[in-house]
Structure formats: structure tokens, C-alpha cells
Amino acid sequence: MSDALPMSPAEFEQALRAKGAYYHIHHPYHVAMYQGRATREQIQGWVANRFYYQVNIPMKDAAILANCPDREVRREWIQRLLDHDGAPGEDGGIEAWLRLGQAVGLDPDQLRSQELVLPGVRFAVDAYVNFARRASWQEAASSSLTELFAPQIHQSRLDSWPQHYPWIDPAGYEYFRTRLGQARRDVEHGLAITLQHYTTRAGQERMLEILQFKLDILWSMLDAMSMAYELNRPPYHSVTQDRVWHKGITL
């Protein structure tokens, strides 16, 4: 199939967007959250585990910058680092996520400690960061194109959570509101890089696999949370109720 003619830019973009059928907005865990069926523990578990993803996104973006020789791309991509880490004197997305944690009843220090992060979530996120470090900068950049589907998921939370979960402090929704605009901006840049770089059929098919890899990461994170918070089968549940799993190994 890789010997076939390349897709046109419009066809390639359509194929990328079709991957939205596998975006984690369709995972039963997410469906339960925006339908109002999630428990307090399930929402807290999601916020705590997703924090590990949030704090690693700047590491992913820094790896892309380190591998990218194109100054113009770096000048634009660095905004993603500032979005999450914050510019000097300004809070970024990580601080906004800590406020979301407080809004759902979690202590910021507990979030920072990562003691609630499930091994399956940690492994998935670490795989993403390691991919960004080892792949070409174009491949790592294009893996971010799950952002094609991100505005919908942020909007679904803003539309449904205040109605279903009045116990959540509305101040915590700042992160979702901010990301609506940032994600749309990031998509334009990431999509432009992708459509320009992948001009052969083999390259386009590889990119679709890379996007599926990223979708697998997001879905696997929720699978781990489903086991722990929906099925009450966290790691080692058959031998202990304690959170004995590792809290991250620094190399």
C-alpha cells in the first residue's frame, strides 16, 4: 500500500481528522463524566492522574525544541512551553490544573507528590515523552495532532460539569476555558507542519500510525483509571489496599 500515490493535502487532512473516532472523548470513563454518572472519587482520580500528563507536556515540547533546527518553528513552538509552565510572573496551565484539583477537593501538595498516579498512566505518559525525545522533530510535533479533537472535549466539560457536579468550585474550570483557544491555535501550527512534511504515501501512513500511537496513550490512561476507580481493581488490589506502586524512578 505504501507504493500507492500520496494523498492530496485535503485527503490527508481528512484521514487525520477521521482518527477522531478513536479519541478518548468516546472512552466510557469520559462518557460517564460528561453524562453526570461519575462519582467524586472518579473525578478526583482523573484529575490526579491527568496531572502527571500535564506536568510532562512541557518536557515533551522541550524535546521537540531541542531536536528542531528550524528557528522559525522553535519561535512558535516555544509558546506551548509558556502555556503550561507560565511566562515570568504569570501562571500557566500547570497552576490552572492545580486549581482544578483544589476545586474537586484535592490538596495541591498531594497532586505534586504524584502519589495517586497509577502505574499504567505513568507508563503511558512516559512513553509519549520518550517518543518525543527519540523521534524526528516533525514526527514528535505531528503526534500532538490529537489537539484536532481537543476543543470538543474541553467544551463538553464546560457544558456538562457545572450542571452535574455542583460540588465542584467553578473557579476550577479556568484550565478548560483557556485551552479552548490555545488548542485551536496549536492545531493550525501542528497541522501545517504535518501537511508540509508528509508528502509520500509511506510517510502519510506512518503519520497516521503515529497519531494512533498518541490516541492509544490517551485511551490506555483511561483504561488504567477505569480499573482503579470504576471496577475497584487498582494495582495489587488482590493482596493489599495500600498504594504500594512506585511513585516514579528518577534516572
UniProtKB/Swiss-Prot annotation:
Described purpose of this protein according to its UniProt entry: Ring cyclization and eight-electron oxidation of 3a-(2-amino-2-carboxyethyl)-4,5-dioxo-4,5,6,7,8,9-hexahydroquinoline-7,9-dicarboxylic-acid to PQQ.
Pathway in which this enzyme or protein is active: Cofactor biosynthesis; pyrroloquinoline quinone biosynthesis
EC number from the UniProt entry: 1.3.3.11
Protein name: Pyrroloquinoline-quinone synthase
Record keyword Oxidoreductase present: yes
Catalytic reaction(s) noted: 6-(2-amino-2-carboxyethyl)-7,8-dioxo-1,2,3,4,7,8-hexahydroquinoline-2,4-dicarboxylate + 3 O2 = pyrroloquinoline quinone + 2 H2O2 + 2 H2O + H(+)
GO biological process: pyrroloquinoline quinone biosynthetic process; sulfur compound metabolic process
Keywords, alphabetical: Oxidoreductase, PQQ biosynthesis
Pfam families: TENA_THI-4 (PF03070)
Protein family: Belongs to the PqqC family.
Gene3D superfamilies: Heme oxygenase-like
